[in-house]
Every structure is written in structure tokens, then in C-alpha cells.
């Protein structure tokens, strides 16, 4: 049988999602725990591989097993065997044609900035700290030119291995909640470092270092060297993955869970 899981993790101490030799990864920890509960070796597939230091509240994975367990037994057993910074949020048996990556229709990320004179001691690894004055409204305005199906060459990592730079961004909102600035973005898929590169460029607009029109000029230039710096990994969260409605996968609050979903720009769209 095939089982899908919703996963949350703090990526601070991991060298990314993907299993690697001699360094810790989220995938390796999950496969180790799953293999223990299933009592056989388990290999997993995910909806989106996150980089070192990047977090998730809405990662989705699937695996195949012949072990018979209730959904609650999988959840409780896994959470008892996983490290404290990885947790299972839901479990559901799915059809064998389901694939965590290829069945997905969209991904959604949030980038959380703590905009304050002083760095935070609590949540320090879960936000990106900027002490400069930042205008979130200008960032939001500048980002609207990124909506639609477009060539995002200017915002892809130099080493990105995707065959095409074209992506379809269906939602982009930047809002402020007290000292927190949240960039909320959804697309059919993302290029390597795309969200962090967009964030880094929008921050230059928010700080008054570049005009609002600059983002549209960057998009048209198709040149990564002209864009802003890559924003730090610690503020980025994979918060949701969309699937066809007929799959009836659980829908939970997007997170990060300490961020009020009632805040402007962070509710469901």
C-alpha cells in the first residue's frame, strides 16, 4: 500500500532535505524512523526538496509498505521515533498512482522577516533578521509584476538544473504584522533559490535602495547577476502543497504555527 504523510520540520541543523553521506538530512531521519515502525527498509519521495536551513510546515511525502498500521499508530509511532525538530502532522492511505511530487499542482512558501533593531533570542533560527527600515507595502507593490507564467531566469540559482526557467506564480503577497514581514508566494513549481532570490531583490525595494519598477526590469533582463542577493535560508518555509481535490488530503493551518493566520495577507486565498 502507499501512504502519504504531512511533515513539519525545523531545518536549522540539517544539510537540506536530501539524504547525503556523512551529514544529517531530513530525509534520512524520516526513513530511519519509518523503517523502524514498518519493520522493513523504507524509501520516501517528497513534494519539494528544501535546502540547508530551510523549514517546512506543509511538506508532503509518500512511501510504500506492506506493514498494516492504523493512521494514528503511524503518527504516534513516528513522532516517538523522530528527533524533536521533525514531526508528522497527518497520515493518509492513498492510491498507488499518487506521487508526492508529480501529483502536486502547486507549492506555497512563506518567507518570514523579523524587522527590528535587535536580533531575537527566541525564534532566531526561524526568522531572518533585518534591522533596516523596510516598507512592506512597497515590496508587495513591486512583486505584483511577477504574477503569471514568466521566465524567471533572473531569480534562479546559477547552478539550477531545471530544464526551463518558466514558472507560473499565482499569488504573491507581502504584509507586515508588527515586527514581522511575511512574503507569501504560490506557484506551480519553483526554481532553485527562486523564493530567496525574489525576497532578496524585493528587500532592496523595501529598504528604498531600488525603485518599485526595478523588479519588472530584472524580470525582463533575464540576468541573475543584476538581481539582489539571495536572502538567508532561516526565514523560508514550505507551507503548503496543492493536490487535486479528489485526493481529499488533509488541510491544516499553513504556519509557521506561531504566525497568526488571521494576519493580513496570510489567510487562505
Swiss-Prot record:
<keyword id="KW-0819">tRNA processing</keyword>
<comment type="similarity">
    <text>Belongs to the tRNA pseudouridine synthase TruA family.</text>
</comment>
<dbReference type="GO" id="GO:0160147">
    <property type="term" value="F:tRNA pseudouridine(38-40) synthase activity"/>
</dbReference>
<feature type="binding site">
    <location>
        <position position="109"/>
    </location>
    <ligand>
        <name>substrate</name>
    </ligand>
</feature>
<dbReference type="InterPro" id="IPR020095">
    <property type="entry name" value="PsdUridine_synth_TruA_C"/>
</dbReference>
<dbReference type="Pfam" id="PF01416">
    <property type="entry name" value="PseudoU_synth_1"/>
</dbReference>
<keyword id="KW-0413">Isomerase</keyword>
<comment type="subunit">
    <text>Homodimer.</text>
</comment>
<dbReference type="InterPro" id="IPR020094">
    <property type="entry name" value="TruA/RsuA/RluB/E/F_N"/>
</dbReference>
<dbReference type="GO" id="GO:0031119">
    <property type="term" value="P:tRNA pseudouridine synthesis"/>
</dbReference>
<comment type="function">
    <text>Formation of pseudouridine at positions 38, 39 and 40 in the anticodon stem and loop of transfer RNAs.</text>
</comment>
<dbReference type="InterPro" id="IPR020097">
    <property type="entry name" value="PsdUridine_synth_TruA_a/b_dom"/>
</dbReference>
<dbReference type="GO" id="GO:0003723">
    <property type="term" value="F:RNA binding"/>
</dbReference>
<dbReference type="InterPro" id="IPR020103">
    <property type="entry name" value="PsdUridine_synth_cat_dom_sf"/>
</dbReference>
<dbReference type="InterPro" id="IPR001406">
    <property type="entry name" value="PsdUridine_synth_TruA"/>
</dbReference>
<protein>
    <recommendedName>
        <fullName>tRNA pseudouridine synthase A</fullName>
        <ecNumber>5.4.99.12</ecNumber>
    </recommendedName>
</protein>
<feature type="active site" description="Nucleophile">
    <location>
        <position position="51"/>
    </location>
</feature>
